[in-house]
């Protein structure tokens, strides 16, 4: 199973990635982890990436694709792999296609923006203990107060409504073109093109997981 998993922040992509990984015995591949590993190991690609990072720039796609190809030669990828959060842009998707990185499925977990805003903007946290609540789905006994210490709860900056909406805007502007890119490739009748699937990410986790596995048949 070789797939790319797409989903907005707060869509529950991480949960489904874990289930897919376990079900098919494949690793989740995160470019952030790859970058850190290569920089730490001092490889040629790692040193090249570090040069750009130290200068405050973005690591060029060619370097990232080099790392991806290197990562896919490792033993744990023999049954496949799951790309989470990559590619993010058309040039990255095109570079993967040009490099001949095999992909069987592109799966998007689709959740309406209004649901994501409700999920994320309703989160409250007790920072000292790491306990989290939700004003609607998992409220504290007393509004705005931690159940254990009686201390006030806070809303993290990342969970503020305007921040969530901004992140969703960025996600849609990047992801819609990606889905179109893979859809167009599949429409050309190329046997190497992945199948593009969309699953509704609302409802119980079990039902979403069932839909995910159904889509990957």
Swiss-Prot record:
InterPro entries: Adenyl_kin_sub, Adenylat/UMP-CMP_kin, Adenylat_kinase_CS, Adenylate_kinase_lid-dom, P-loop_NTPase. Gene3D superfamilies: P-loop containing nucleotide triphosphate hydrolases. One of its GO terms (cellular component) is cytoplasm. It catalyses: AMP + ATP = 2 ADP. Pathway: Purine metabolism; AMP biosynthesis via salvage pathway; AMP from ADP: step 1/1. ATP binds at residues 10-15, 123, 132-133, 203. Residues 122-159 are annotated as: LID. CDD domains: ADK. It is found in: Cytoplasm. Its EC number is 2.7.4.3. The keyword Transcription regulation does not apply. Pfam families: ADK, ADK_lid. Belongs to the adenylate kinase family. PANTHER family: NUCLEOTIDE KINASE (PTHR23359). HAMAP family: Adenylate_kinase_Adk. This is Adenylate kinase. It comes from Dechloromonas aromatica (strain RCB).
């Amino acid at each position: 199973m070789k797939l790319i998993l797409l989903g907005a922040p707060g869509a529950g992509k991480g949960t489904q990635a874990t289930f897919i990984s376990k079900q098919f015995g494949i690793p989740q591949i995160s470019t952030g982890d790859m970058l850190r590993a290569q920089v730490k190991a001092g490889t040629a690609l790692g040193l090249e990436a570090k040069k750009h990072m130290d200068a405050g720039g973005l690591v060029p796609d060619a370097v990232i694709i080099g790392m991806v190809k290197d990562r896919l030669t490792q033993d744990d990828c023999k049954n496949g792999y799951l790309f989470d959060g990559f590619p993010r842009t058309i040039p990255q998707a095109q570079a993967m296609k040009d490099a001949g990185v095999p992909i069987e499925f592109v799966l998007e977990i689709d959740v309406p923006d209004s649901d994501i805003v409700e999920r994320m903007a309703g989160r409250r946290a007790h920072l000292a203990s790491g306990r989290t609540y939700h004003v609607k789905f998992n409220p504290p006994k007393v509004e705005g107060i931690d159940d254990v210490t009686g201390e006030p709860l806070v809303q993290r900056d990342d969970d503020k409504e305007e921040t969530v909406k901004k992140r969703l805007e960025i996600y849609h502007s990047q992801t819609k073109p990606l889905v179109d890119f893979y859809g167009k490739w599949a429409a050309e009748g190329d046997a190497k093109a992945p199948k593009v699937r969309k699953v509704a990410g609302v409802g119980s986790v079990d039902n979403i997981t069932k839909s995910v596995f159904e889509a990957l048949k």
